[in-house]
Structure formats: C-alpha cells, structure tokens
A protein has these predicted regions:
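Helix-start (N-cap) detector for alpha-helical repeat units in TPR-like alpha-solenoids
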Residues: 24-25, 68
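Canonical positions in the second alpha-helix
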Residues: 15-16, 50
C-alpha cells in the first residue's frame, strides 16, 4: 500500500481474509486498503466485522493492535 498497487493489495488481502477469517490484523489492513481506494463503505463493513470478532487465544496483543488501528481508521473515514 505504501506507494504500491492498491487494487492488487485489496485482492491479496481479500484472499487472506477468506483463508484466515480470525486474523484481526489482516482485516484491519484490508479496511485500510479499502479506505485508500476510497471504498469507505467496505472499509466500515470490515471494521464492523473486526469489532464483532473475539480474540483468538494467544493472539490477544495482535487483536488489541488491530482494534486500536480500526478505531483510528473509523474516525478518519467518518
């Protein structure tokens, strides 16, 4: 996403989210990619899905990082 191909990033992140639906960091990165592509409704839906998730045991720090980033992004796209 940093100077890269946003549509390609979205495609990879969508595949990753399907393969690892419990990966909170993958979901927040997907939301960020949607926002970068001005697809704010999809970014918000992804954030809503993330906020509804429960952390996977052993991955609480990553989950908390993703939640913090999601809330920050949510404020930015409103």
């Amino acid at each position: 996403m940093l100077g890269g191909d946003v549509p390609k990033a979205i495609a990879y992140l969508e595949k990753g989210a399907k393969l690892a639906p419990d990966n909170a960091l993958m979901r927040v990165r997907l939301a960020e990619a949607y926002a970068a592509a001005n697809r704010n409704a999809e970014a918000q839906k992804t954030i809503d899905d993330l906020l509804a998730m429960k952390p996977v045991a052993g991955y609480e720090p990553e989950y908390n990082e993703a939640i913090a980033a999601a809330k920050k992004l949510q404020e930015k796209i409103k």
